[in-house]
Structures are given as C-alpha cells and as structure tokens.
Regions:
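Local beta-strand N-terminus motif with an aromatic residue
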Residues: 3-4, 137, 337
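Active-site phosphate-binding/coordination module
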Residues: 1-67
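Short linear loop/turn motifs
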Residues: 138-146, 254-259
C-alpha cells in the first residue's frame, strides 16, 4: 500500500446524492437513467428560454440532469431537501468518505445543468431558476486537483495507508475520453456500453441549432467534450439477448461458447438493412439526439419472413442509426472525423463495429482495452495530479489499436437509404409514445 502514489475515480454522471453535514446519504441516489423530474423540466422552461439555458450550460433542459433531480427532491421530499448539506455525484460521495471533503470537479459539475460552462462556476441564474440554494452545491475543483488525503478512519476501513492523496478524477464519459487518447483537438471516441455515446475533443463547445448534442467540461485544461449520449445503446442489445435469445443461451452452455458468439453468426447471415426491419432503441426514453423521456422502443417492418437473425441485426443497426444522428450534427458543424476509437462491451462484436464503420463512413478502431478506458483515464488524471506523469500525452504509452474496420462501400447505399426512414419512423410515432406513456405511470 505504500506504493500507491494517488487515488482517483471515474463515476457515472448526472446523478444526485443528497448528504447531510455528517456525510450520510439521506435517500437512495437518483441516477442518470432516472427520468422522474419531467414536471420540473416544464417549470424550468417557464422561467428561462431553451436557447439561453443551452448556451449557459452546454446542455438541454432535461430530467436526466442532477440539478433537475435535486429540484424534484425539493418539490416532492422537502424534508430531505432541507436536511441536504450538499448534493454530490457518486464518485464525489466516495471522495467524501475517503477524505471528509465535500467537493466535485468541472466534468461532473457540467452534468448537473447548474454549471456555467464558459466561466466554469456555479451559475447564480440557473440556481435561481431551479430554486436551489447555492450553499447546497459542493466546492468546485479541477479534475487533477487533490481533494484531500485518506483519513485514518477510511484507511482502517479500506486497508489503505492514511495520507494518500485523493485526486478528484472525472465523470465516466470524460475519463473515457482521456483513456482513449482524446486529449487533443479533433480526436473522437465512442462507447458502446449500457448507454452509448460519441464524443470529440474541441477547444470550444459545439452548439447545435436543434440542441441534439451537448458539451461536457473536459479533464484536460483548455478543452471541452461535445457529446451525444443515447440512453440505451448497448442496453438495447443486452435487453434483446436476455429476453429473446434464451435458446442461444442454452445452446451456448451446451457447446461451451458464449451466446454472443452464436449471435455474431446470425448477424452475419442477415444482410445489411436486416431484411427491411427497423429497431427504435428507446427502451428507457431518450437523451441525445431525441431528448424525449416518453420515447419507446419498437420493431418496425416485422413480417412472416422475418427471422431472428434479422431482429438481432436490426437492433445493432438501430443503435448505429441513432448515434449516426450525432455524427451528422458534428459533421454539419464542420468537424472532420475520419477515425473513431470504440470501447465498451458492444465493441466486442465485430459485426457491430463493421455496421458502425458502414453507417458513419469512417474507420472504426478497436483498442487493446474495451472495459477499462474509464479507469485508465482516472488513473492518468491521478498521475498528472500528483506529478507522476508530466501531462496527458502519457496515454500514448498505454493505448494501442488492435483492429480497424473500414467502410464497406457495398453496404453504404443501403444504410444511406435507411437512415432517413429511421428518422421518419421515430417522428411518426412520437404521438403514440405520448399516449402509451399514460399506461406506464
């Protein structure tokens, strides 16, 4: 334990943990996927224009964000709100337990919708709009700042040595950017995890007129991280394989192979376009690019000839089409993306990587680690914070590209034709989604 130079964290973003002065959690955490604050979203829109809000925060008004969640707590659990000393995100809560310090840093702060992205400070205007007391917000630090040191009590509980520096770290999406080498202008990455996103490092925020994308603060000083995150990317595939692929699970157990290996074969047996089948991947509502908490998932184009192989492929294509909207936003702003590193569990699917290359019409790169990019980003942030590493360029020593998928020109006409149909299908069903939501309250 004496060899530990620093401790740091990557954690899920857009959450809300209410703690009292003793650091005790007052209720269960509200996580990024919690969309209950829809009434608060409407209240905010009555108090500030969507455009002003977007340019202040880099984000849309949405129940996904931590500030709206705390607003919900105030409106629905006033006693908990009154007893809340600070609102924290999950990694900040662990930092509190290790150091006794109530802090956050710019990346997680930018997931609250209470941070002025340009000034990197809590916005008095937004706090007033949401009716949140400024003193309930934690101290703001840089990602590379030392929040404190491991206390004697924490050291005893965790088997650590007291006095180890604890560096703030960052939100998972931003740590992933560092872990995939997106530490300089114009480098892009995508994560195919439960939620899935595309991010690119730039010096200035990218503001989309339709507000389909948003911008995080970056761990690396002088940069920001324009991003589009869908709620249920890899999660859509996980849902499908769990609920509709029980045969493959049993067969895989008998043959000693993964069900995902069997499904890879099925995807390969279905042609691009999935035999005219579309999948809308909105199983838990949607953030970017739709920003519709009432959106639902759907298969469109089912017919007697449809086979499971088509359905599996349609799920992967649907996620790619949805993230493709984010790509189109960035390209429409003049951002050139020729290569993209893809991480997350979904990146283990060679078929999916090829679909991404074909839909985006860029090279898709698979690195030497898929699940550890966020941890790598946090570790490098810690090293820079305590001087073990001179700067973030050290990622080049760890990150290696193992495989590259190039676009298949034979498949692109199909995807170019289907992408607008995918968009048309979503917009045609928005009214249906609204009506169905009445049955799921």
């Amino acid at each position: 334990m004496n060899d530990i130079a620093a401790i740091s964290f990557s954690g899920q973003m857009m959450g809300c943990i209410c703690v009292d002065k003793e650091g005790r959690a007052l209720r269960n955490a509200l996580i990024w996927a919690d969309m209950r604050a829809t009434k608060e979203e409407e209240m905010i829109r009555e108090r500030i224009s969507e455009e002003d809000f977007y340019h202040l925060t880099g984000h849309k008004i949405s129940p996904s964000y931590g500030g709206q969640k705390l607003m919900w707590v105030k409106n629905n659990e006033p006693e908990i709100y009154e007893n809340t000393y600070k609102m924290l995100n999950c990694k900040d809560y662990i930092i509190l337990k290790l150091t006794g310090e109530f802090v956050t840093e710019y990346t997680d702060a930018s997931s609250t919708n209470l941070l002025d992205l340009n000034k990197l400070e809590w916005s008095d205007r937004l706090l007033e709009v949401m009716g949140i007391d400024r003193e309930k917000m934690p101290a703001l630090l840089k990602s590379t700042d030392v929040a404190g040191t491991v206390t004697d009590e924490a050291a005893k509980a965790c088997g650590l040595v007291s006095g180890i520096p604890v560096v703030c770290g960052g939100g998972d999406g931003v740590c992933a950017a560092v872990g995939t080498g997106c530490t300089k202008e114009g480098i892009a990455h995508s994560c195919m995890g439960t939620s899935s996103w595309i991010s690119i490092t730039t010096e200035k925020p990218i503001y989309d007129e339709e507000m389909r994308t948003f911008t995080w603060a970056h761990i690396v000083p002088g940069y920001v991280l324009p991003t589009g995150t869908m709620q249920c990317g890899g999660g859509s595939y996980s849902w499908f394989t769990k609920e509709l692929c029980k045969y493959e699970s049993l067969l895989g157990e008998q043959q000693g192979v993964s069900k995902y290996d069997l499904l890879e074969q099925e995807i390969g047996d279905s042609k691009p376009g999935a035999n005219g089948l579309l999948f809308l991947p909105y199983l838990i509502g949607e953030r970017s690019p739709r920003w519709n908490p009432k959106a639902k998932g759907a298969f469109i184009g089912l017919k007697m000839e449809t086979e499971k192989k088509d359905m599996v492929r349609a799920v992967q294509e649907g996620v790619a089409f949805n993230l493709g909207v984010v790509m189109d936003v960035f390209k429409g702003k003049g951002v050139a993306i020729d290569d993209m590193i893809v991480i997350g569990g979904g990146a283990q699917s060679d078929a999916w990587l090829q679909i991404l290359a074909d839909v985006y019409n860029i090279n898709i790169q698979k690195p030497n680690y898929l699940e550890e990019a966020t941890s790598m980003g946090a570790a490098i942030t810690a090293g820079v914070g305590v001087g073990v590493f001179e700067n973030f360029d050290v990622i080049d020593k760890f990150l290696k590209i193992e495989e590259t998928k190039t676009p298949n020109t034979d498949n692109q006409p199909v995807y170019s034709a289907m992408k607008p149909i995918f968009d048309e299908a979503y917009f045609a069903l928005t009214g249906v989604f609204d009506k169905l939501s009445e049955f799921t309250k």
